[in-house]
């Protein structure tokens, strides 16, 4: 099975070390462009663009990278409860059209009540997933070309429709990650690819089996992906030294503050990440070559595969054997590590190198009439 390898645009900051200003660098448009172009040339399928108040806006960043890349896809966040599904569907179709079919979407419900309140969202965990399920139903139906009337608990639309369809049919793929039962149920019913953070293989296997069974109950087939950091070097010793350097400027106070911030979230996935290290620096290798040091201060994906190219490739193939076909990777700093992964890891894997897409013809059309419909040629009698 050929593997889809993704990289990451660090719109929330980048540098050589975690938890310190030492070794950091400005993340401006030029730097993000360098990373995107490197990923494009090295054969990554796409890049994940993060979302949240600590990040630059993912949609604007993605749009700005379209003209400087050729085949790279952009995995951009959909935010239920923050954006209406109709507006989000229009944005999705436009990004897909402008990128010539290179748009992918990642459903993000949010997990930090404090940040969500700042965005005007006051739903609890269960309510957010209810709203996300309704949002996704409407969003997908609009991209399928339907005129949608929907009266749910959280979402209400009447006569919603798109005038401009996406390039990818029936619609651009939808990704989603969540570890709670309600999150898995949403994934099983409505998304195309379920993402998990990088837990040990036995825990990932358990998740995949649960989601696959729930999807089968809905008559739905689903793909799987995993989000991991990577520290790959020419030798295993060099890789482990690099891992230790990454957290060499971390002090106990910074770790404690970070863990306290993570504790206020209601994300089951974040709780599972934190349980892998319990905020302590000892015993960070939680599974062969799987290191939890990143999660001491970084929210979300907090584990890294560490080793030389063949070793990391063997661990990736272990995950692939569980049914995972997409790997969303990152490393610090992201420009240099994009090359290291491409040069030291890719030769040991069956990587699906994307082709440059051919321009897709768009139907000629006149200006929309009354902002309501596209004029069609009148049949001759």
From Swiss-Prot:
Entries under InterPro entries matching the protein: Alkanesulphonate_mOase_FMN-dep (IPR019911), Luciferase-like_dom (IPR011251), Luciferase-like_sf (IPR036661), SsuD_RutA_monooxygenase (IPR050172)
UniProt keyword DNA repair, yes or no: no
EC number: 1.14.14.5
GO BP annotation list: alkanesulfonate catabolic process
Substrates-to-products reaction catalysed: an alkanesulfonate + FMNH2 + O2 = an aldehyde + FMN + sulfite + H2O + 2 H(+)
Source taxon at top rank: Bacteria
Keyword presence, Flavoprotein: yes
Keywords: Flavoprotein, FMN, Monooxygenase, Oxidoreductase
Something else known: FMNH(2) which is absolutely required for this enzymatic reaction, is provided by SsuE.
NCBIfam families the UniProt entry points to: alk_sulf_monoox, PRK00719.1
SUBUNIT field: Homotetramer.
Primary role: Catalyzes the desulfonation of aliphatic sulfonates.
PANTHER family recorded: ALKANESULFONATE MONOOXYGENASE, ALKANESULFONATE MONOOXYGENASE-RELATED
Entry's family note: Belongs to the SsuD family.
Protein name as it appears in the record: Alkanesulfonate monooxygenase
Organism: Escherichia coli O8 (strain IAI1)
Gene: ssuD
């Amino acid at each position: 099975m050929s593997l889809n390898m993704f990289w990451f645009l660090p719109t929330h900051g980048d540098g050589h070390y975690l938890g310190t200003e030492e070794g950091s660098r400005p993340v401006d448009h030029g730097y993000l462009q360098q990373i995107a172009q490197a990923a494009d040339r090295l054969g990554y399928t796409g890049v994940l663009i993060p979302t949240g108040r600590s990040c630059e806006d993912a949609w604007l960043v993605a749009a700005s990278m379209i003209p400087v890349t050729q085949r790279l896809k952009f995995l951009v966040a959909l935010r239920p409860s923050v954006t209406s599904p109709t507006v989000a569907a229009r944005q999705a179709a436009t990004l897909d059209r402008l990128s010539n079919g290179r748009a992918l979407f990642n459903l993000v419900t949010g997990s930090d009540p404090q940040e969500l309140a700042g965005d005007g969202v006051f739903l609890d965990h269960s309510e957010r997933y209810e709203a996300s399920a309704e949002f996704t139903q409407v969003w997908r139906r609009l991209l399928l070309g339907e005129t949608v009337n929907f009266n749910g608990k959280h979402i209400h639309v009447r006569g919603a429709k798109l005038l401009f369809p996406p390039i990818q049919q029936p619609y651009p793929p939808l990704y989603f990650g969540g570890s709670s039962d309600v999150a898995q149920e949403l994934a099983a019913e409505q998304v195309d690819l379920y993402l998990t953070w990088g837990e040990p293989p036995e825990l990932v296997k358990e998740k995949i089996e649960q989601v696959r069974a729930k999807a089968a109950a809905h008559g739905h087939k689903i793909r799987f992906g995993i989000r991991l950091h990577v520290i790959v070097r020419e030798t295993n010793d060099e890789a482990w030294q690099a891992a230790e350097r990454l957290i060499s400027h971390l002090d106990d106070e910074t770790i404690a503050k970070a863990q306290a911030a993570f504790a206020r979230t209601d994300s089951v996935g974040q709780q599972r990440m934190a349980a892998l290290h319990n905020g302590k620096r000892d015993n960070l290798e939680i599974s062969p070559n799987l290191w939890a040091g990143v999660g001491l201060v970084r929210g979300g994906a907090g584990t890294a595969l560490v080793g030389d190219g063949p070793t990391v490739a063997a661990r990736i193939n272990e995950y692939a054997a569980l049914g995972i076909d997409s790997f969303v990777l990152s490393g610090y700093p992201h420009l240099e590590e994009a090359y290291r992964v491409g040069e030291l890891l890719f030769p040991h894997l069956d990587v699906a190198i994307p082709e440059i897409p051919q321009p897709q013809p768009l139907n000629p059309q006149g200006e929309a009439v009354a902002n309501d419909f596209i004029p069609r040629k009148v049949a001759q009698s």
